[in-house]
Amino acid sequence: MKLLRFGELGQERPALLDAEGLIRDLSGVVEDIAEDTLTPEGLERIGEIDPASLPIVEGTPRIGACVGRVGKLICVGLNYADHAAEAGMDLPPEPILFMKATSSICGPNDDIRIPRGSEKTDWEVELGIVIGKEARYLDPDQAMDHVAGYCVVNDISERAFQIERAGQWVKGKSADTFGPIGPWMVTRDEVADPQNLGLWLSVDGQKYQDGTTQTMVFGVAHLVHYISQLMSLQPGDIIATGTPPGVGMGQKPQKFLREGQLMELGIQGLGQQRQRSIAWDA
């Protein structure tokens, strides 16, 4: 299934995308695409519904973040071998983790606001793992049972805030609008192999990122297992699994977002995003 949320910011309603690409309103069935809805029982309940019995959403509504009330947005750094090579850094011996403020989350096509004082706002297309079952100290072979599905994440990053301002990376990762997710969450059963997905990103029509999840250093199952040893995971938590090469910081010369530019990005089978960069005060 493809589950999504539509409507104005703060007033999103749950929906699914049917086989014909029509948005079907789920608000008469579930409160939101969040928390208990993402559990195996919640997804089974939605899966038993005939999509044709649900109201069609007319027009072209705003698409919101595909998961509501995200408890944790956990990110993995340097998790693509070719991206680490681009950055001139050794492969990490275990996953590099950092948190991204959930207040950064926005819809997949919302404008990206460049923070005040920013000169190095950058892009990162990433595969997002949506947790569907509470997890603590998982055995490796249990990890995938705790995954509800997958989504596209753009891990927008302000490199000067992240790298040059001392402290942790969260400084450059957490501005409002720095976490577009969606357009929808695709349930785990519809993604045959999360380690064989193409992902790409372009700016103003020029493709900068064109990679595959095959080059991940640590795969989906390992990440879920590993993180569960360090913190509990709850339904609706999202893990952003790292980015392939082609970020602006890695260009020669470096390139960063300016006001009025258009980012387009996507992951094979998971949909596409489209964002315009604007001034913070626009």
Residue spans of the language-model regions?
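Catalytic-pocket segment enriched in acidic/His residues
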Residues: 5, 9-10, 53-58, 62, ...
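RNA pseudouridine synthases
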Residues: 131-133, 138-153
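Structural signature of FAD isoalloxazine-binding scaffolds in flavoprotein oxidoreductases
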Residues: 90-108, 121-123, 258-269
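Generic beta-strand structural signal
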Residues: 71-74, 94-96, 108-112, 119-127, ...
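Residues embedded in well-ordered beta-strands
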Residues: 14, 126-130, 151, 200
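N-terminal non-catalytic cap/leader segment that marks the start of a structured domain
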Residues: 1-95, 192, 207, 281
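A generic local secondary-structure boundary/capping motif
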Residues: 63-65, 86-88, 112-121, 127, ...
